[in-house]
């Protein structure tokens, strides 16, 4: 797949989209009433993360994606945190992810880097959950 095309893997389907991954993520943020830049800024304020930031695409359904490299890198893969079942090291620079639907992908990312990205996205989810609980208890 080239820099202008993406392979999208969903729970029940897989297809090719004639758009780069970042454009798809930007569209998804806009679809749910925000912007990619706004979501990125929100992550920065909550976590202090400025590079390879996880993004909340939609907060009520807890749709959080994280990148495997810089978002501008044409080899960047965006992963939905909630869809991961497990992951394991293939070699020092490659890791496999098994999704909850049984699909498996092999990525050019070290096990440590992927773990760090998952932890960042999980921390973002935790902070959002805490804010929602805090707000619900005040009402």
What are the language-model segments listed below?
Residues 1-79, 85-139:
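Eukaryotic intrinsically disordered, low-complexity regulatory linkers and tails enriched in Ser/Thr/Pro
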């Amino acid at each position: 797949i080239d820099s202008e095309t993406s392979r999208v893997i969903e729970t029940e389907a897989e297809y090719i989209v004639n758009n780069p991954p970042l454009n798809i993520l930007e569209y998804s943020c806009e679809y749910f009433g925000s912007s990619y830049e706004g979501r990125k800024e929100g992550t920065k304020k909550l976590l202090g993360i400025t590079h390879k930031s996880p993004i909340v695409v939609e907060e009520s359904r807890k749709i959080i994606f994280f990148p495997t490299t810089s978002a501008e890198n044409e080899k960047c893969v965006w992963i939905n945190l909630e869809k991961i079942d497990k992951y394991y090291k293939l070699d020092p620079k490659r890791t496999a992810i098994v999704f909850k639907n049984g699909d498996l992908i092999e990525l050019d990312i070290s096990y440590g880097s992927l773990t760090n990205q998952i932890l960042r996205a999980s921390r973002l989810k935790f902070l959002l959950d805490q804010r929602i609980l805090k707000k619900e208890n005040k009402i």
